[in-house]
């Protein structure tokens, strides 16, 4: 059965940390493909503060061009209204039929997992893959993983990756201060930031 990773996010902007996480998940889990899913209108973020979805889609598409095993899906962008993870995974499950989905997310999401809508459907349609992030204690995360594994009769995959302390927030702030960012970004993304004059008035 084909194994497909699903990596969602606002990607505002996408940076080399995102590419590293997706690549490591692809290799470690022996996935056939990783789908990047730029968020449309995420329920947990202030929509007015997020770059236009079409531009974010363009940045992700450009960033993953060199990788044949990465692809992009515009379901959440095309979908009207709020974007919930369980709906996205249900859509992919129904679209691909005979596949095993792996939903890739960060440690912060594991900590707040009980606040997610229809969490049982997330486990029904996918394997949850959690990667560590700076500022989160590994032992506490593994304890939470065990608690959720028992509560939902599942087996969350924990990826102990290098902590790359790069964030989209940091990049936006550096652009606002007219500092160099090209070494944080995949080729071509900085050109799109310049093209649309992004992040210079936050």
From Swiss-Prot:
SUPFAM superfamilies: Nucleotidylyl transferase. It catalyses: nicotinate beta-D-ribonucleotide + ATP + H(+) = deamido-NAD(+) + diphosphate. The keyword Ligase does not apply. Keywords: ATP-binding, NAD, Nucleotide-binding, Nucleotidyltransferase, Pyridine nucleotide biosynthesis, Transferase. One of its GO terms (molecular function) is ATP binding. GO terms for biological process: NAD biosynthetic process. InterPro entries: Cyt_trans-like (IPR004821), NadD/NMNAT (IPR005248), Rossmann-like_a/b/a_fold (IPR014729). Catalyzes the reversible adenylation of nicotinate mononucleotide (NaMN) to nicotinic acid adenine dinucleotide (NaAD). Pathway: Cofactor biosynthesis; NAD(+) biosynthesis; deamido-NAD(+) from nicotinate D-ribonucleotide: step 1/1. This is Probable nicotinate-nucleotide adenylyltransferase. Belongs to the NadD family. Its EC number is 2.7.7.18.
